[in-house]
Amino acid sequence: MRPGDGNRVTGDSMSRRIVIVGGGIVGVCNALALQRAGHSVTLVDRTTPGRETSYGNAGVLSESSIGVLNNPGLLASLPKLLMGRSNSVRFSPLFMVRRLGWMLKFLSYCTTSRWQAAGRALRALQTLSLDQHKAWIAEAGVDDLLRYGGWTKALRTTESFEAYAGELALADENGVVYSVFDESQLRQIEPGLKPIYKKAVLYDETCGVSNPAALTDAYVAMFVESGGTVLQASVSGLSQGESGWHVGLDGADDLSPDDVVIAAGAWSAEIAGWVGYDLPLGWERGYH
């Protein structure tokens, strides 16, 4: 079974007991996919699934967000970013010092070839993901949550649009469908916007959901109806032995699965650290 296949699988391979740590949309989607691959899956979260970051996000289902942050133009803008003269990023100097090796490697990937390779990989992943979401949304009977109409990036100056040319070239190389609008056309399609934008790019195939929490709830319901288990408990420990994993829980009995998936968002690095992984994980600001 390829990842993202929405069909249930009775299984050609041996079923395994799997614990998913984290009940956001990523953890829930992992739970559904693994369950349909024939495995016995338990989803663990300290709160009701979908009530952390997955509750307050924009609900965008994109197949066009393929330009990674360490792009060829980042090095030129680095002095401005480091001196705090940009509203687009805030960072912790202490974090950067502690992760200097990782930061230098991150910057070493600011080349055109590596940026293009990352774009191709993201395009393949996002296209598959969008198709899967549409299939699961239909299966869950929550088509009313799905919103078509694309996603618009508005640019205030002609210069900023020209600087965006690299993103559009990457989109062209990967078959992303988009439309470019001038100032007057933008006012026609988005009359509520202030008249401060000179250009806009509409990514036509992008869609979204009106209520991300409701979508997560619908996926969880499918998971439970198919025999999945949801535990509301805090993960207090994680260790690996000869016979499998041990997951310590506060609020429920400990678990002993064959495999563990860590999908705990901003808390994933801490949990992974319990078993020896040192992940230089960063995260964006909270949404709510």
Question: How would you name each of these model-derived features?
Answer:
Residues G56-A124, D144:
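Glycine-rich active-site loop/strand segments that organize a redox cofactor
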Residues A31, Q35, M222:
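Gly/Ala-rich phosphate-binding loop of Rossmann-like dinucleotide-binding domains
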Residues T47-E52, G251-H288:
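Central helical "cap/lid" subdomain
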Residues G27-V28:
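N-terminal Rossmann-fold NAD(P) dinucleotide-binding loop
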Residues R36-Y55:
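Glycine-rich FAD pyrophosphate-binding loop
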Residues L100-A221:
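Rossmann-like flavin
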Residues S15-G24:
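Beta1/beta-strand and adjacent pyrophosphate-binding region of the FAD-binding site
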Residues E183-I189, L231-W245:
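A conserved short coil-to-beta-strand element within the FAD-binding core of flavoproteins
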